[in-house]
A protein has these predicted regions:
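A conserved short beta-strand
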Residues: 72-82
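Alpha/beta-hydrolase fold nucleophile elbow
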Residues: 45-56
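Short beta-strand/loop motif that positions the catalytic acidic residue
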Residues: 94, 100-102
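C-terminal catalytic histidine-bearing segment of alpha/beta-hydrolase fold enzymes
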Residues: 122-175
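Short alpha-helix in the alpha/beta-hydrolase fold that links the catalytic acid
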Residues: 110-121, 129
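Gly/Ala-rich beta-loop-alpha elbow adjacent to hydrolase catalytic centers
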Residues: 55-59, 63
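Serine-hydrolase catalytic machinery in alpha/beta-hydrolase-like enzymes
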Residues: 1-45, 142-154
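Acidic catalytic loop of the alpha/beta-hydrolase fold
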Residues: 105-109, 138
Length: 175
């Protein structure tokens, strides 16, 4: 999905600032994600009864927000995405199954946000799974992130392989 809009393709560090606009305005983020979903659902080559959303980093945040919006998707997968919500009561809207794949040592996702996410899922009886990878930090699927965990973002081959496997199994169960 093109959350940012036509012609906007920010690169780090500008990408973080641009994503921050949408993290600060979840209504806008959800609207953009749902607009993309609507385009996909209307495509004649698409079976609109068999939709799922996956995303990495900010895209993972968007996938979870899509679920929180009550979107008609069977499931969402977030790879090292943000888990926080300014409105955890919106968990009541989630109809999708949720798979969150997280680096256990990710410095960009606070422990309180993980706890709140888990509580939100439990409190609203969401069908969910949270997988945490010990020794993995943010961007664990991105080879170009390097291998220096002290920078907060680094590739982790084991977490990358297993998270892909987890997603494959999740999607097989959905479809």
């Amino acid at each position: 999905a093109d959350i940012y809009g036509q012609g906007i393709r920010p690169q780090p560090p500008a990408a973080g600032k641009e994503a921050g606009k949408y993290k600060a305005d979840r209504t806008l983020l959800r609207a953009r994600a749902n607009a993309a979903l609507d385009v996909l659902a209307r495509d004649t080559r698409t079976d609109a009864s068999k939709l799922a959303a996956t995303g990495y980093c900010f895209g993972g945040t968007a996938a979870i927000e899509l679920a929180r919006s009550g979107a008609k998707v069977l499931g969402v997968v977030s790879f090292h995405g943000g888990l926080d919500s300014p409105t955890p009561a919106d968990g009541k809207n989630i109809k999708a199954k949720v798979l969150a794949l997280h680096g256990a040592d990710d410095p960009f996702v606070a422990a309180k946000d993980i706890a709140a996410f888990k509580a939100e899922m439990k409190d609203h009886y969401v069908d969910w799974k949270f997988v945490s990878y010990p020794g993995a930090v943010h961007s664990f699927t991105h080879k170009a992130a390097g291998n220096d965990n002290s920078k907060g973002a680094a590739y982790n081959a084991d977490a990358d392989r297993d998270s892909w496997y987890q997603m494959e199994q999740f999607l097989k169960r959905l479809f």
